[in-house]
Amino acid sequence: MLEKLFKLSENKTDVKTEVLAGVTTFMTMAYILAVNPSILSAAGMDSGAVFTATALAAFVGTLLMAVLANYPFALAPGMGLNAYFAYTVVIGMGYSWQYALTAVFAEGIIFIVLSMTNVREAIFNAIPRNLKSAVSVGIGLFIAFVGMQNAHIVIGGSTLIELFSLDGYNQVNGVEAAFSDVGITVLLAIIGVIITGILVIKNVKGNILWGILITWGLGIICQFAGLYVPNAEVGCYSLLPDFSNGLAIPSLSPIFCKLDFKGIFSLDFIVILFAFLFVDLFDTIGTLVGVSSKADMLDKDGKLPRIKGALLADAIATTAGAVLGTSTTTTFVESASGVSEGGRTGLTSVTTAILFGLSLFLSPIFLAIPSFATAPALIIVGLYMLTNVMNIDFSDMSEAIPCYICIIAMPFFYSISEGISMGVITYVVLNLLTGKAKEKKISALMYVLAVLFVLKYIFL
């Protein structure tokens, strides 16, 4: 039966290899079950409900990938997009998380339509290659900065941001912080970065997840030793799992189907929607092509067979995820870990999906993991995204300058969408004024986007 469903022999694999690959993929991306609730709770969402939504979105999306495309790719709420959701749209722009979920829902619907045609691939090809890489790099810096903030490694100060002093006077959330609460967590987060770095260098499977768990374990030891004292005023809570409700699955009701369609025709909504579309579009296609090329899944023309099914799975998962109550669901680059273990078919994805389903019963463990333990994961994931800087052509200043503006704008303005806006505007203007626009054959879509972004800055 499995042979017939997934064409194992045709793909030169077997059940044992596929199952092992699925377990490996889950191990490398299970950190999202701890990180996503941590990030989205900053936007005012219930962390328990977000955990459930995250696990369900990953389960549904990964299963759809197996059914619609028969590929060993796993999906879950994406890093970068969840940070944009919480820190830019909600905290930065002042919109409700319900409004942000509506933008994610709209993005999913649009992607379903685009994925059933060839438009999604056409849009991908319209954006300059260098600018695509710059967006990834900028998001990497943004995520790393968010990680350092969550761990209180950097805090607000007289120079806008400054390092937390382990033995000096610090203000966190407007309250004086002591070494026994925030100070020790800063130290643990730094140790966590070192531990995770060692695991990455040693190529340990599930390195990010193991980094989180080890850092959390060190924190628990510090709590028992009296070095860490929970202090809710500065966001430091008990590090021990709360099993008072047993292994009950946290209710989805606080966030399920909480969409807000008021104001969806505003320019702000269009900008927010485009940012979700833009990042998810390139992240998904880039991951699909990158991982599949390593596994020799591309055809002789360099194209991925059944890509329409893979894109449709991604689009449906995003729409379902928004209804469940989480940010954009996308294909994870960590799928490469399962592929490296020999995963070649949807059976790998089915295995990963089942494990995400089972994780629903372990919510007390994942929800007890503190932000100082997930911060190293954000910082290291930021590094992975930063590697795309090597794909930018810095020898051509008409390409380098817009990419540079795009990259630095994201962490400096604390907004992914501002980075994209400034990058697109700068790219079009510089190439027009230097006479290179015709030579580069800049697409009509780029001109439309540049005009929309300029209007946004003028009227908003």
Spans of model-derived segments:
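Helix-coil boundary and interhelical linker segments in multi-pass alpha-helical membrane proteins
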Residues: 38-49, 88-99, 266-270, 368-370, ...
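Juxtamembrane transmembrane-helix boundary signature
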Residues: 58-79, 110
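Membrane-embedded alpha-helical modules
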Residues: 93-214, 350-460
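Alpha-helical membrane-protein architecture signal
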Residues: 12, 16, 191, 270-274, ...
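Helix-loop-helix junctions within the multi-pass membrane cores of secondary transporters/permeases
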Residues: 2-36, 57, 78-87, 91-139, ...
